[in-house]
């Protein structure tokens, strides 16, 4: 039978990935089977089991995960791709890394059958601490029960165009061009 599962989508900017993996550790510490995924892109995390949909053993590995006792974390995505820092990226690393590409929303919803808790990074912000979403964002699956919004407090007092993804929308609101607590 289907296990009860909490679908949690994490959106916004600064701190999404850290928040997602901290929650994963806490839920695993409570004996839950946790799947971590994305509907956009995330860097491939170190120290976690990763299974990709484009691997032939994908479904078999998901089934094995369901049979494990609680307290485990599995990271899954559609595929792995090379990533090099672009001119609009604000990630702290310059070297080439691997990124995981998210699955389609209907595919993510199916992961609920294999876990107790499903954590989804559902937004991208090019590594910046603040984001104004476009009309098609964030990519939240219908099965989401909780949405957590993140923003980096390091942006407070900084110039919007330096710390905000899609800053042009905020610059129209704030004439002095600075990020404030109220703005976040």
Question: What positions do the PLM features span?
Answer:
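Walker A (P-loop) phosphate-binding motif
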Residues: 1-28
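Solvent-exposed alpha-helices and their adjacent loops that cap or buttress functional pockets
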Residues: 1-3, 28, 64-68, 110-113, ...
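General beta-strand structural signal in soluble alpha/beta enzymes
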Residues: 10, 34-39, 74-77, 118-122, ...
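Short active-site-adjacent helix-start/loop capping segments
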Residues: 17-19, 43-47, 52, 81-85, ...
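Conserved catalytic-core segment of NTP-binding enzymes
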Residues: 84, 93-117, 122-184
């Amino acid at each position: 039978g289907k296990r009860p599962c909490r679908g949690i989508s994490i959106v916004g900017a600064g701190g999404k990935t850290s928040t997602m993996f901290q929650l994963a550790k806490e839920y695993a510490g409570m004996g839950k089977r946790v799947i971590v995924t994305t509907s956009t892109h995330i860097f491939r995390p170190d120290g976690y089991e990763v299974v990709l949909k484009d691997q032939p053993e994908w479904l078999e590995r998901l089934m094995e995960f369901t049979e494990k006792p609680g307290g485990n974390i599995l990271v899954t995505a559609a595929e792995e791709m090379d990533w090099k820092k672009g001119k609009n990226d604000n990630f702290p690393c310059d070297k080439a890394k691997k990124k995981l590409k998210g699955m389609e929303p209907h595919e993510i919803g199916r992961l609920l059958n294999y876990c107790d808790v499903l954590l989804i990074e559902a937004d991208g912000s090019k590594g910046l601490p603040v984001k104004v979403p476009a009309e098609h964002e964030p990519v939240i699956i219908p099965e989401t029960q909780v949405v957590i919004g993140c923003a980096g407090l390091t942006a407070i007092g900084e110039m919007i165009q330096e710390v905000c993804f899609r800053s042009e929308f905020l610059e129209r609101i704030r004439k002095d061009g600075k990020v404030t607590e109220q703005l976040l």
